[in-house]
Regions:
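Transmembrane beta-barrel wall of Gram-negative outer-membrane proteins
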Residues: 169-171, 176-210, 215-261, 287-291, ...
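Outer-membrane beta-barrel domain signature, strongest for Gram-negative TonB-dependent receptors
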Residues: 225-402, 406, 552, 557-559
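Membrane-embedded beta-barrel scaffold of Gram-negative outer-membrane proteins
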Residues: 298-302, 308-326, 512, 518-522, ...
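Signature of Gram-negative outer-membrane beta-barrel scaffolds
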Residues: 372, 399-514, 534, 644
Length: 752
């Protein structure tokens, strides 16, 4: 399938600039009418929101044509990112100090639909939509975000898929380069008139991305440490213009699969210094095998009285088995005496026998059953229906744009996991026995939720007020069948339940000083529900404030925002990726936490400023974040441990900076982008950073350029990590892990 796809892609490819223009004509009868696909709207203005909002259009995304969403989001102030695998396969994203692990503290959506595998019961984003096929990215923070949930502490991230074009159009692109990278993206579709006032059309889209990886496994130098991804989307759209209402129906089907040879096993400090792209031989079999599908049916009616009814029924399924190194048992006596790879890499000297097995040097042979590799096998299901009614009216001298929404949702995660046992034999893993499937973890976590919101944007003279209220009613359940009842007879079934009712108010305000300057602020409740089976019955709660100012002129735009989030209770969630030494899925109270910060964003066109014959865009984003605990406590959550008042949260950099300058001369263009991330703690603490529990700051430069061969054909080049900076990105869950090295990609795009 891969060779067929690449051959087809090589025939013709659509330029990203044309794609951006196509995107401007989103296939909808509603024109600027409100809808539930977007937060801001492809034609919307983030500045019109009384709060913090950012919109990255298809034109923005085309500059570097990133396949890694973490590189895309470096350009957005207030977004915290912890790199992991170098490709953004399972990104760690937070906002305003929420924590970043598996993006489980923010609300993730695609086309306005919750897209985490199980958004309520298991939100850790082991699936993330592939950004290489997206037409836009929306980020919203602050009080306006109460429209979205269930997580409102930091903000929402909404990825916009390719819309059905208004007219017949096609797009194909191909990239080839270092690490044997092969990436293709193609779509074809459009709308056609089939009767007076009736239109029908659709879209077929395919996306492929693969690379051999930049790490080398000891003894297996030719083995891929990269990935292969395929992603397919189909849409059918039907539009009817009527006397009473203009209506549209859209069916969306999506399927993707991933096979990636990635690991949680990092390196010791000394081995990282010697060769940061080395992988110990015990990780030779680590592999993620995953499939995802999405089905949705949308309906929208724009009535003559300017009222818009939107509805979507949706279902997502995600299955994955991450077969990866779990524990080491030097004497082979049984899993009870085995050590986790996190504890071994944290103290290799004190775990010399286990670390020797991990290294698997030539001439070394372990006992049988010394290496335990786990099938981290999970199936997820999420489904629901959501409605939104929106409209505009004038009343008492003010203009109102009101919205009312309802979502009925259910999701679940089915964990059915087991281990295989191996002997390390001269650097090669030899299987010695298998455990019974389900004998390591055997449970179902589920949630049922009803959410309601109401929001009104009131415009009076130069003032805009946006009060809003969200209500979440959530029932959570964990059904633990136990490790002995692998047939799930229920003989040892333990059921835990929890219910949460939450009112989430928010209020935003904007004052337009004149046509160029506006001031804004807001306050809202930050909320996140507990997990099924949590050790805490408490929700995550905060009171979040923001104040800011914007200035927009003909050729430049600047924005400054200050924020303060006062957590009454911060929750930490145990995942494999935290290396926390706890039961996966359990949650821990962190008590009171204060997060304060500043976000600065600016962009200008130096070409317009100096009346040059070409465009020269300059853009930048700076984030300052300070997050610290306000109480003393001892936690069973590894990244926290023994906490003292004033301890800073892990993996939240104090400073982040992004800057880019480009050129667009019509027939050629390009950009150089630089991002700098401050040093971070890898566990809670204060004072001078300990090199063994921190990651140094780093600067990464990316560059891209394009040349218009014809009006429809572009030749492109993109360089990741131009200076070949060697840097660490994390110490969790098991040892130091590197960022991606320099890679050069060459591309061709054609539109038709």
């Amino acid at each position: 399938m891969r060779s067929i796809f690449l051959a087809a892609t090589a025939l013709s490819t659509l330029s990203s600039a044309t794609f951006a223009n196509t995107n401007a004509a989103v296939a909808t009868d509603s024109n600027s009418a409100p809808d539930i696909i977007t937060v801001i709207g492809l034609n919307g203005d983030p500045d019109a929101i009384p709060g913090s909002a950012d919109m990255l259009t298809a034109e923005d995304l085309s500059i570097h044509d990133y396949a890694d969403v973490t590189r895309i989001l470096r350009a957005v102030a207030g977004v915290n990112i912890q790199e992991e695998d170098g490709y953004g396969l399972r990104p760690n994203i937070g906002m305003r100090g929420t924590g970043v692990d598996r993006s489980d503290k923010i609300t993730l959506m695609e086309d306005g639909v919750l897209i985490s595998p199980a958004p309520y019961s298991a939100p850790a984003a082991y699936y993330f939509p592939h950004s290489g096929r997206m037409a836009g990215v929306e980020v919203i923070k602050g009080a306006a975000g109460v429209r979205y949930g269930p997580r409102t502490q930091g903000g929402s991230l909404n990825l916009l898929s390719t819309p059905v074009p208004e007219e017949t159009a096609g797009f194909m692109s191909l990239w080839l380069g270092d690490e044997n990278t092969q990436r293709g993206h193609a779509y074809f579709g459009g709308m056609t008139d089939i009767d007076d006032g009736v239109r029908f059309g659709g879209l077929l889209e395919g996306y492929f991305d693969s690379a051999d990886g930049f790490k080398t496994i000891d003894g297996f130098e030719d083995q891929s440490t990269g990935y292969e991804i395929e992603d397919y989307v189909g849409k059918l759209r039907f539009e009817i213009d009527g006397d009473f209402a203009d209506q549209s129906f859209e069916l969306k089907l999506q399927y993707s699969d991933e096979l990636s040879n990635v690991t949680y096993l990092g390196l010791t400090d000394s081995d990282f210094a010697a060769d940061p792209f080395r992988r110990y031989s015990a990780s030779q079999l680590d592999q993620m095998d995953a499939e995802h599908s999405e089905q949705s049916l949308r309906y929208q009616a724009v009535f003559n009285n300017d009222v818009v009814l939107s509805a979507v029924a949706y279902s997502t399924e995600f299955s994955r088995d991450w077969f990866k190194l779990d524990r080491i048992d030097p004497d082979g006596a049984g899993a009870g005496g085995a050590s986790s790879i996190s504890s071994i890499l944290a103290n290799p000297g004190g775990n010399a026998a286990a670390f020797e097995i991990i290294q698997g040097a030539a001439g070394f042979v372990s006992v049988d059953d010394a290496v335990l590799i786990k099938h981290n096998n999970r199936d997820y299901l999420a489904q629901g229906v959501q409605f939104e009614l929106a409209g505009e009216l004038d009343m008492a001298g003010a203009s109102h744009m009101w919205r009312v929404g309802l979502r009925i949702h259910e999701d679940e995660m089915d964990r059915f996991q087991w281990r295989e046992h191996f002997r390390m034999d001269n650097g090669t893993l030899v299987r010695t026995r298998n455990d019974v499937p389900g004998s390591e973890s055997n449970r179902i976590d589920s949630a049922e939720a009803v959410a309601f919101f109401i929001q009104d944007e009131i415009v009076f003279d130069q003032w805009t007020f946006t009060p809003g209220l969200r209500f979440e009613q959530i029932d959570l359940m964990r059904e633990d069948f136990g490790k002995l009842d692998t047939d799930r007879t229920g003989a040892n079934l333990v059921v835990k339940t929890n219910s949460v009712d939450a009112f989430i108010p928010g209020f935003g305000i904007r004052y337009d000083v004149n046509s160029e300057i506006s001031l804004f602020g807001g306050v809202h409740r930050g909320f996140a529900p507990p997990a099924p089976g949590s050790t805490t019955q408490d929700t995550e709660d905060a009171t979040n404030w923001e104040f800011g100012a914007r200035y927009a002129a003909d050729f430049w735009h600047v924005e400054a925002i200050g924020f303060f989030n006062a957590y009454e209770n911060l929750i930490g969630t145990c995942t494999n990726s935290t290396g926390g030494g706890c039961v996966i899925g359990d949650q821990f109270d962190g008590g009171e936490v204060d997060v304060s910060g500043v976000e600065l964003t600016g962009n200008m066109d130096l070409g317009k400023m100096f009346d040059l014959p070409f465009s020269m865009p300059l853009r930048g984003a700076y984030t300052y974040t300070h997050a610290e605990f306000q109480t003393d406590f001892n936690s069973g959550f590894g990244p926290w441990g023994n906490v003292s008042t004033g301890d800073e949260l892990p993996y939240i950099p104090e400073h982040q900076l992004f800057a880019a300058i480009g050129i667009d001369a019509g027939h050629f263009g390009g950009e150089i982008a630089v991002s700098w991330v401050d040093e971070v703690r890898t566990s809670a603490g204060q004072g001078a950073l300990d090199p063994t529990t921190s990651v140094e700051g780093h600067t990464v430069t990316d560059a891209s350029a394009w040349y218009a061969v014809t009006d429809n054909v572009r030749a492109r080049v993109s360089v990741r990590n131009l200076t070949d900076e060697v840097y660490a990105v994390a110490r969790r869950p098991a040892g130091v892990r590197p960022g991606s090295p320099r890679a050069v990609l060459f591309g061709l795009s054609v539109d038709f």
